[in-house]
Amino acid sequence: MSVSCCCRNLGKTIKKAIPSHHLHLRSLGGSLYRRRIQSSSMETDLKSTFLNVYSVLKSDLLHDPSFEFTNESRLWVDRMLDYNVRGGKLNRGLSVVDSFKLLKQGNDLTEQEVFLSCALGWCIEWLQAYFLVLDDIMDNSVTRRGQPCWFRVPQVGMVAINDGILLRNHIHRILKKHFRDKPYYVDLVDLFNEVELQTACGQMIDLITTFEGEKDLAKYSLSIHRRIVQYKTAYYSFYLPVACALLMAGENLENHIDVKNVLVDMGIYFQVQDDYLDCFADPETLGKIGTDIEDFKCSWLVVKALERCSEEQTKILYENYGKPDPSNVAKVKDLYKELDLEGVFMEYESKSYEKLTGAIEGHQSKAIQAVLKSFLAKIYKRQK
């Protein structure tokens, strides 16, 4: 099926679900940008469109001519995709569409542009699913997004490893089918390959600090934490969506290193939030049970605790951090409260927001300012 045919079919699907005046997703800037933050109806329409594109992409993959599916294997992949790709908040994927709209500076998106920006957004959601399926196995996690981790679902187990590999390969099937005739196709492939490598390297740094028998809090520092976060989270969660939108808009990524730097800083702020929520948020609100303490993670909280601990408090931290027993975890959490790490985080959040806002407002392009502000608005003071 050609790209144009896919777009026509998508258009028919969208017209049934969404009023015609919502088919063109308008770019928003200035006062309209503020209205976008306040308007739930437009976000609902965008999400409906986005989910329609997921159905098209999933159908493509379930009928990929490169593999002769049996009914059983097709049903497995169908279920696996819905469980792992479709079940998140979709913030990364939707951010591609939001960013591209803002870069268009008030011009209506064509039906094909809507489809392609959504398709790129879904490639990032596929990448996220691939990382999380394997990350949950490595961390021996229990829940993800309010339900059992995929590998803990009955009859899945270690088949989840192969499912992760499938998810990774699906990305390039989508890119080839829908973008190979675009002038930025090679740049897209390079971008996804580079970001995947960066994320895998960040995961490696994170994992090798937690070897059994080699746990040493002395090697944890803010610089190590930043390095892990920059590579493991910031590039794929913050830079990748904007980079995809910039490529679709005909931009050269080498001309936007300053944008990358702001997004990396935003990604670090996001991960510090994540570290804080892992310990202090309600698991039901968060959608998962935090295990950073048990897993001996190089968390921002433990790094800040090490900076503030007395000799006696340091001893308590060394004796209890990285142990799975609930009593050990409770002692670490009690210590965090004693050190007022909640207050330390609140101060960090306020200063980070001020710094990021200043960097964004200093950018010469109003369209790029709007893109960066939209990202910051989505994460500032988030609860999950």
Curated annotation (Swiss-Prot):
Any one Gene Ontology BP term: geranyl diphosphate biosynthetic process
What are the binding positions for isopentenyl diphosphate in this chain?
Answer: 89, 92, 128, 145
Q: Which reaction does it catalyse?
A: isopentenyl diphosphate + dimethylallyl diphosphate = (2E)-geranyl diphosphate + diphosphate; isopentenyl diphosphate + (2E)-geranyl diphosphate = (2E,6E)-farnesyl diphosphate + diphosphate
What does the entry list as the binding residues for dimethylallyl diphosphate? 144, 232-233, 271, 288, 297
Q: Could you tell me the EC number(s) of this protein?
A: 2.5.1.10, 2.5.1.1
Q: Name one GO molecular function term.
A: (2E,6E)-farnesyl diphosphate synthase activity
Q: Which InterPro entries does the annotation name?
A: FPS1-like (IPR039702), Isoprenoid_synthase_dom_sf (IPR008949), Polyprenyl_synt (IPR000092), Polyprenyl_synt_CS (IPR033749)
Subcellular location, record wording: Mitochondrion; Cytoplasm
Cofactor(s) the protein needs = Mg(2+)
Per the record, the pathway is: Isoprenoid biosynthesis; farnesyl diphosphate biosynthesis; farnesyl diphosphate from geranyl diphosphate and isopentenyl diphosphate: step 1/1; Isoprenoid biosynthesis; geranyl diphosphate biosynthesis; geranyl diphosphate from dimethylallyl diphosphate and isopentenyl diphosphate: step 1/1
Q: Does the keyword Glycoprotein apply?
A: no
Q: Please tell me one Gene Ontology term that the record gives under cellular component.
A: mitochondrion
Gene3D superfamilies documented for this protein: Farnesyl Diphosphate Synthase (1.10.600.10)
Q: Where does Mg(2+) 2 bind?
A: 135, 139
Q: Which Pfam families match?
A: polyprenyl_synt
Alphabetic keyword roster: Cholesterol biosynthesis, Cholesterol metabolism, Cytoplasm, Isoprene biosynthesis, Lipid biosynthesis, Lipid metabolism, Magnesium, Metal-binding, Mitochondrion, Steroid biosynthesis, Steroid metabolism, Sterol biosynthesis, Sterol metabolism, Transferase, Transit peptide
Tissue expr: The FPS1L mRNA accumulates preferentially in inflorescences, whereas the FPS1S mRNA is predominantly expressed in roots and inflorescences.
Question: Where is Mg(2+) 1 bound in this sequence?
Answer: 135, 139
**Co-factor: note:** Binds 2 Mg(2+) ions per subunit.
Domain of life according to the entry = Eukaryota
Q: What does this protein do?
A: Catalyzes the sequential condensation of isopentenyl pyrophosphate with the allylic pyrophosphates, dimethylallyl pyrophosphate, and then with the resultant geranylpyrophosphate to the ultimate product farnesyl pyrophosphate.
Q: Which family does it belong to?
A: Belongs to the FPP/GGPP synthase family.
**Name used for this protein in its record:** Farnesyl pyrophosphate synthase 1, mitochondrial
**What species is this protein from?**
Arabidopsis thaliana
